[in-house]
A protein has these predicted regions:
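N-terminal mitochondrial targeting presequence
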Residues: 1-29
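Beta-propeller domains
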Residues: 56-95, 120-153, 205-210
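Conserved core positions of repeat-based scaffolds
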Residues: 62, 114-117, 129, 181-184, ...
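Residue-level signature of beta-propeller blades and closely related beta-rich strand-turn architectures
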Residues: 66, 77, 121-122, 133, ...
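Solenoidal tandem-repeat scaffolds enriched in leucines and small polar residues
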Residues: 175-325, 337
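Loop/turn-rich, solvent-exposed surfaces of beta-rich toroidal or solenoidal domains
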Residues: 341-343, 352, 360, 377, ...
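Blade-level signature of beta-propeller repeat domains, shared across WD40, Kelch, NHL, RCC1
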Residues: 410, 416, 424-460
């Protein structure tokens, strides 16, 4: 056989290509014009369609600050020879560890420079953490084993061992992360906590001079209700939400963020009363020190920090230590809420999103302060004549940025682009929602202070 015989790419048949000269030398056919080449390529194109029974794969994407290890891709911080470290990821990057380990991620918690995953595999329900571990917020990791070398930074998802009594039958249902602490909710064995407890945010007594780094201790909350349904971490405080809609809190209270009627620290989870007493609460939102609570009826209650007029609708004070009802009737029935460092966002049953507070709110550079909720125009989230049914179904936030999810699986971000946390591929702040390019359909979103993680399904 002639060494050059075989298939030749039609794109290579350019005027000056040696392949063209070889191909025309041994044939009587005239050379193809560009139009004929394109037509032939189109005829030879093979299109593969996904079958009706094809299974869509789970995907995890992350972006933002990679220097802490929170992204969970080790090659960014330990590159191969000839490559440079990557400290900022400005576009969605696929976290392939889950695929290699055959893990399905069900829940995610994002803290300040660390990420915790709840996973399911043939081994059962497990917890993995990656990122900053200076306060043991993602567990005790000795590497290599039996060397006494405990990791302050973990650059790839690593198993977090919990002292479960019934490891094979107890399931982890949720995880929440604060500045330096983590809460883990189980279906049969209560709530476990890891990390910094300087203000009682882990729900146990404060120990003066306690060293949190390289600490193998895993705490189980005591004297709490048996029917905890959700857990939430703020800056240095925590919330427990029961199936009855009652809310318990502990931790730092200097801005009234615990909602217990005082400004002291509290190490024992205590029931919050005030405006939410007797009201069934379904969601708590608190990334910073301002807290929003949603009721089953779609009403909004709030307490905590109001230095940026987040709560100026009901008070002129800069802090509120007890829940108050926010009269937001013009916004409709609220189903989702997010509370950042200086601004808030809510979503109603129509899929409309409202913002208020101070900073980059999402309605352009001219609006940096609002004392009452203002609606971001729906077309900014992809609602238009071609897709009139697109609506927002969820919103979360870091301290300075928002992330919204629409009912067609698209993700939009806006705010300060700290360490690439917006995922837009450019280094600049974003003053209105812009769609993030993700090669999959997103169904869950989570934010840390400077990174973002989304759970997705492949398109086919």
């Amino acid at each position: 056989m002639h060494p050059l015989r075989g298939s030749i790419c039609l794109n290579c048949l350019s005027k000056w290509s040696p392949w063209r000269r070889m191909s025309t030398r041994n044939t009587t056919e005239p050379p193809l014009s560009k139009k004929q080449q394109k037509r032939k390529m189109k005829e030879e194109t093979i299109t593969q369609y996904a079958g009706d029974n094809s299974k869509r794969a789970d995907r995890v994407y992350a972006w933002g600050c990679a220097s802490t290890g929170a992204i969970g891709i080790p090659s960014y911080l330990k590159p191969e020879k000839g490559q440079h470290p990557i400290y900022t990821v400005r576009q969605p990057a696929r976290v392939k560890f889950m695929d290699r380990a055959n893990l399905k991620v069900t829940k995610v918690g994002c803290g300040y420079g660390f990420t915790v995953y709840v996973t399911i595999s043939f081994r059962g329900n497990r917890l993995y953490g990656t990122g900053i571990n200076t306060d043991s917020q993602i567990g005790y990791h000795e590497f290599p084993r039996n060397t006494g070398r405990v990791l302050d930074y973990v650059i790839e998802p690593t198993l977090i061992d919990l002292p479960l009594d019934h490891r094979d039958t107890t399931n982890i249902t949720q995880v929440a992360c604060g500045r330096g602490h983590t809460l883990i909710l189980t279906d049969k064995e209560g709530v476990f906590t890891l990390g910094n407890n300087a203000y009682g945010q882990c729900g146990r007594p404060i120990v003066e001079g306690e060293v949190y780094g390289q600490n193998p201790r895993v705490n189980k909350m005591k004297d709490i209700p048996d029917n905890i349904a959700k857990i939430v971490c703020g800056h240095d405080h925590s919330f427990l939400l029961t199936t009855d809609g009652e809310v318990y809190s502990c931790g730092l209270g200097c801005d009234g963020q615990t909602g217990l009627g005082h400004y002291r620290t509290t190490s024992q989870p205590t029931k919050i009363k005030g405006g939410i007493e007797g009201v069934k609460i379904t969601q708590i939102a608190s990334t910073g020190d301002c807290v929003l609570a949603l009721s089953e009826e779609g009403d909004v209650f709030a307490w905590g920090n109001s230095e940026y007029n987040q709560l100026s609708i009901v008070t002129e004070q800069t802090q509120i230590n007890i829940p108050k009802y926010l009269p937001l009737k013009h916004c409709g029935k609220i189903i989702k809420a997010a509370s950042a460092g200086s601004k808030c966002a809510i979503v109603n049953t129509k899929g409309e999103l409202f913002v208020w507070g101070y900073g980059i709110l999402g309605k352009g550079p001219k609006l940096e302060s609002a004392t009452e909720p203002e609606m971001i125009p729906p077309p900014l989230f992809g609602c238009n004549e071609l897709e009139p049914d697109v609506s927002v179904i969820d919103v979360v936030c870091g301290l300075h940025h928002f992330v919204a999810l629409t009912n067609n699986g698209s993700v939009y971000t806006w705010g300060k682009d700290k360490h690439g946390c917006l995922g837009l591929g450019i280094q600049r702040d974003q003053y209105f929602p812009l769609k993030v390019s993700i090669p999959a359909e997103t169904h869950s979103i989570q934010c840390g202070v400077d990174h973002t993680v989304v759970l997705c399904k492949s398109f086919c």
